[in-house]
């Protein structure tokens, strides 16, 4: 009777479900074998259930430890950190290990040198000697990498506002503009043209000439045309009181230029640090010479096809050290003479184009009457003419205003200019 009931119950199930629920081998077993099989499955289920529970407990324990470690990490990574420099990275086999691992030696700002067998939470492969890192003040493990440090005086040399000067703002310097474009602008904007010919562009340019002839103005216009970072260094700024301070400024300036590239470094008044070397027992003279040697080293330290160009300006090329002028450093020398008559007329027109000028102003005659004027003095003529027109209550500048302006500037102009190193 029981067999009939079982068969009836089995026939009421779908064929696929019946095969999934009861394997064929079960029907070939005796009742004792079925009971024994059921007990084995029940024991196996209990074992799996206990393993499942233990795994859950183990997972909860791991999650708890992860949370505790994250909390500790968050506490330990809170500022402030100690600042340290990476001194050395060592590959060595630690106790209990078979494979070599990377260890780090750091020098903290507290003047301690620390060996870290386990560096910390940063990627050691990305660390380099000299890198700046933040370390925990208690365990000294490395928590973060810091950006490179530059002298604050060097950062102040970077001109944040992009130069707005254009070549059209410069008069009488067409040849000089062409030479500067070939030496500085083209290598930065059309590098492939030099590569196709197979020549290397010059590293730097030396502009020399009397004051007020447009050297700084042309350097700013050049930086504006290349859309590059513009670092302006003055020679007297690099002469510092402490030994090695000026050389560090030069070193940091070139390091900042490499990071911010493409960059134009403009060194004004180069004769302040670039004078010919001589024997001296005065420590100040030796420090100036050390600064110049660092400048020579930095000029040799980057290739001519790098995105760094050096433009130097001086009034006294005759007192510069020959090592600065040799090929491979400041290759191109561009002279800025006093403007001729045609150039003076062009400069006067440029500086007066935004003024309300009468049509009877003869710039050619003004150019003839302003012989030996430089560009800055010609600009002063236009300013003086405007002040004279204001003084007489006029609304536009007439020719006589410019003539009186020339007389005013001529009266202030020194007859002889002497420069001392």
Swiss-Prot record:
It holds the Pfam family Prot_ATP_ID_OB_C. Keywords: ATP-binding, Cytoplasm, Nucleotide-binding, Nucleus, Proteasome. One of its GO terms (cellular component) is phagocytic vesicle. It is found in: Cytoplasm; Nucleus. One of its GO terms (biological process) is proteasome-mediated ubiquitin-dependent protein catabolic process. GO terms for molecular function: ATP binding; ATP hydrolysis activity; proteasome-activating activity. InterPro entries: 26S_Proteasome_ATPase, AAA+_ATPase, AAA_lid_3, ATPase_AAA_core, ATPase_AAA_CS, NA-bd_OB-fold, P-loop_NTPase, Prot_ATP_ID_OB_2nd. ATP binds at residues 209-216. May form a heterodimer with a related family member. The 26S proteasome is involved in the ATP-dependent degradation of ubiquitinated proteins. The regulatory (or ATPase) complex confers ATP dependency and substrate specificity to the 26S complex. Belongs to the AAA ATPase family. This is 26S proteasome regulatory subunit 6A homolog. It comes from Dictyostelium discoideum. The gene is psmC3.
């Amino acid at each position: 009777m029981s067999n009939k009931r079982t068969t009836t119950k089995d026939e009421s199930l779908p064929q696929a479900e019946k095969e999934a629920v009861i394997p064929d081998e079960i029907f070939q077993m005796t009742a004792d074998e079925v009971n024994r099989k059921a007990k084995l499955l029940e024991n196996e289920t209990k074992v799996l259930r206990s393993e499942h529970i233990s795994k859950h407990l183990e997972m909860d324990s791991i999650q708890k430890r992860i949370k505790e470690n994250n909390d500790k990490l968050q506490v330990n990574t809170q500022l402030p950190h100690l600042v340290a420099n990476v001194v050395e990275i060592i590959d060595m086999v630690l106790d209990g290990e078979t494979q070599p691992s990377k260890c780090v030696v750091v020098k903290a700002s507290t003047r301690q040198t620390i060996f870290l067998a386990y560096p910390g939470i940063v990627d050691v492969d990305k660390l380099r000697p000299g890198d700046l890192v933040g370390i925990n003040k208690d365990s000294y493990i490395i928590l973060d990498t810091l950006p490179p440090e530059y002298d604050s005086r060097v950062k102040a040399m970077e001109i944040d506002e992009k130069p707005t000067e254009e070549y059209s703002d410069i008069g009488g310097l067409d040849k000089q503009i062409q030479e500067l474009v070939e030496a500085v602008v083209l290598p930065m904007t059309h590098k492939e043209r030099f590569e196709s010919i197979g020549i290397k562009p010059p590293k730097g340019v030396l502009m020399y000439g009397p004051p007020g002839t447009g050297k700084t103005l042309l350097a700013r216009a050049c930086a504006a045309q290349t859309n590059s970072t513009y670092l302006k260094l003055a020679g007297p700024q690099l002469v510092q009181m402490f030994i090695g301070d000026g050389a560090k400024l030069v070193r940091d300036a070139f390091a900042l230029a490499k990071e911010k590239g493409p960059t134009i470094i403009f060194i004004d008044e180069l004769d302040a640090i670039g004078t010919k070397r001589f024997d001296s027992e005065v420590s100040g003279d030796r420090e100036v010479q050390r600064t110049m040697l660092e400048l020579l080293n930095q000029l040799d330290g980057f290739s001519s096809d790098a995105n760094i160009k050096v433009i130097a300006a001086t009034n006294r090329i005759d007192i510069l050290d020959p090592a600065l002028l040799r090929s491979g450093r400041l290759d191109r020398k561009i002279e800025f003479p006093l403007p001729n008559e045609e150039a003076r007329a062009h400069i006067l027109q440029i500086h007066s184009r935004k003024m309300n000028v009468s049509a009877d102003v003869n710039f050619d005659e003004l150019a003839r009457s302003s012989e030996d004027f430089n560009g800055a003095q010609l600009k002063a003529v236009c300013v003086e003419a405007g002040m004279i027109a204001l003084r007489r209550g006029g609304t536009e500048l007439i020719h006589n205003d410019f003539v009186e302006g020339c007389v005013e500037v001529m009266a202030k102009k020194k007859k002889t200019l002497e420069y001392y190193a």
